[in-house]
């Protein structure tokens, strides 16, 4: 089960098969040109993620304006001395020459490309939920909050209580 959870394509397939909503996936790009083409039709942007793993390792939140050829990418990846590292810090990139090798490295993992769905807000921060369950029982829920679009807690983001959400009832 753990291996299935770390395989993003397989996890999405299982969740969908059990009538749970998942972030819409786009066709997987295999080159930087295909990525730019896919992003041209995605006004909110997309997340390019390695197929396997967790903890924001290797993800890229990407926005692209094709008319201006303008890129904005948020990622934990950084290329240092021709080696790509997961820095556990979010970097903002705008130069195609910096973005291209990172995106190609992620695509070589059998990446997935997801539509960027805006997150709800709680007290001025974006949030999402990390839900852990076994069988049909929810074990716990963590509300993950961030000023940006990437909410993973190991990136110095904030955890909040479920009871702080305006939609929850005691």
Segments (PLM) and residue ranges:
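ATP-dependent carboxylate/phosphate-activation module, predominantly the ATP-grasp catalytic core
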Residues: 65-170
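Conserved N-proximal alpha/beta basic substrate-recognition cap immediately N-terminal to
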Residues: 1-41, 54
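Broad hydrophobic/π-residue packing in well-ordered secondary structure
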Residues: 38, 42-44, 95, 129
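Glycine-centered flexibility motif
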Residues: 25, 53-58, 127, 156-158
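Residues at the C-termini of beta-strands that transition into short coil/loop
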Residues: 26-29, 63, 142
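ATP-grasp fold ATP-binding core
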Residues: 11-17, 39-63, 73-75, 103-121
């Amino acid at each position: 089960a753990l291996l299935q959870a770390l395989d993003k394509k397989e996890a999405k397939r299982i969740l969908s098969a059990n009538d749970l909503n998942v972030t819409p996936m786009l066709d997987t790009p295999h080159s930087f040109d295909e990525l730019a083409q896919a992003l041209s039709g995605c006004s909110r942007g997309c997340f390019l993620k390695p197929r396997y793993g967790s903890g924001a390792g290797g993800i890229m939140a990407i926005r692209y304006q094709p008319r201006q050829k303008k890129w904005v990418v948020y990622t934990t990846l950084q290329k240092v001395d021709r080696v790509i590292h997961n820095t556990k810090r979010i970097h903002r990139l705008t130069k195609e020459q910096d973005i291209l090798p990172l995106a190609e490295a992620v695509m070589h993992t059998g990446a997935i490309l997801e539509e960027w769905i805006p997150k709800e807000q709680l007290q001025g921060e974006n949030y999402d939920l990390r839900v852990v369950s076994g069988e049909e029982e929810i074990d716990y829920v963590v509300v993950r909050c961030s000023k940006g679009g990437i909410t993973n807690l190991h990136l110095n983001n904030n955890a909040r209580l479920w009871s702080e959400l305006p939609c929850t009832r005691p």
